[in-house]
A protein has these predicted regions:
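A short, exposed helix-loop element centered on a Lys and neighboring polar residues
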Residues: 121-122, 166
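Canonical Rossmann dinucleotide-binding motif of NAD(H)/NADP(H)-dependent dehydrogenases/reductases
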Residues: 1-32
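C-terminal helical subdomain
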Residues: 174-186, 199-243
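The beta1-alpha1 cofactor-binding region of Rossmann-like NAD(H)/NADP(H)-dependent oxidoreductases
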Residues: 39, 59-71, 103
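Substrate-binding pocket helix/loop in short-chain dehydrogenase/reductase
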Residues: 68, 97-98, 105-107
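Active-site loop of short-chain dehydrogenase/reductase
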Residues: 2-3, 53-54, 81-83, 97, ...
């Protein structure tokens, strides 16, 4: 019987979502790749299958309740096996000063960063509770812990997601569901930074960004933890990062 995983918030292949999908597939899980852009989703699915892994692509909007429910319904009914791991990786690190900010901007950042996490977390728990086991992991950021002048909307969303994860862990941990929150305290060495803002990537250097391999190792470590020694929150940063 196969083990299934859902990764929500998959963008470029050389990003955290893509790296997580490829790592889980290499470990033998059937990965449901969920993202907004069909072309990126299908390209990643093809790469996983070409490497001998199992993957199913689902283009969806994590802020739409019906999309999230449909994703979980498909994961449960597509193939044999059980859904054992769900990762919520969606987020929009949009910057802006409060006095110039439209309410619609703040709401959209919150919807992706927090509301989507609620919808995904709720559906994961609903499907896992009858079995009394499963793992739900949320991707956090520096802004999960503290707000800065230009992170008003992003920090509010990420702090909300962190509180959601804490509430879920305390409510459902005793029922066998492991809920974890990963604080990524630094830039990620993926396409969004390396190709999107190359000057910043060059200034930080290879040792100044969090490696994708290191991140996927950490998520896999959390997933494989025994019940007698669960971690709820894990923070990761390059050794050069001040904190």
């Amino acid at each position: 019987m196969e083990t299934k995983a859902i990764v929500v918030g998959v963008g470029p292949r050389a990003g955290l979502g893509g790296a997580l999908c490829e790592r889980l597939a290499r470990e033998g899980l059937h990965v449901f790749v969920a993202g907004r852009t069909p072309e990126k989703v299908e390209a990643l699915v093809a790469a996983i299958r070409n490497a001998g892994g199992r993957a199913t692509g689902v283009a969806m909007d994590t802020t739409r309740e019906q999309d999230v429910i449909a994703l979980f319904d498909r994961a449960e009914t597509d193939g044999e096996g059980v859904l054992d791991l769900v990762i919520y990786n969606a987020g929009n690190a949009a910057m802006g000063q409060l006095h110039d900010m439209e309410a619609s901007f703040f709401e959209q950042v919150w919807r992706v960063g927090c509301l989507g996490g609620f919808l995904v977390g709720r559906e994961a728990v609903r499907r896992m509770l009858p079995r009394g086991r499963g793992t739900v992991l949320f991707t956090g950021a520096t802004a999960s812990l503290r707000g800065k002048p230009n992170t008003t909307a992003f920090a509010a969303a990420k702090a909300g997601l962190r509180s959601l994860a804490q509430s879920m862990a305390r409510a459902y941990g005793p029922q066998g569901i492991h809920v974890g929150h990963v604080v990524i305290d630094g830039g990620i060495a993926g396409d969004k930074i390396i190709k999107g803002i190359p000057q910043f990537a060059q200034a930080m250097g290879e040792d100044g960004l969090v490696s994708l391999t290191g991140l996927t190792d950490a998520y896999w470590y959390l997933y494989r933890q025994p019940k007698a020694a669960w971690t709820h929150e894990l923070d990761l940063r390059p050794f050069k990062e001040s904190f």
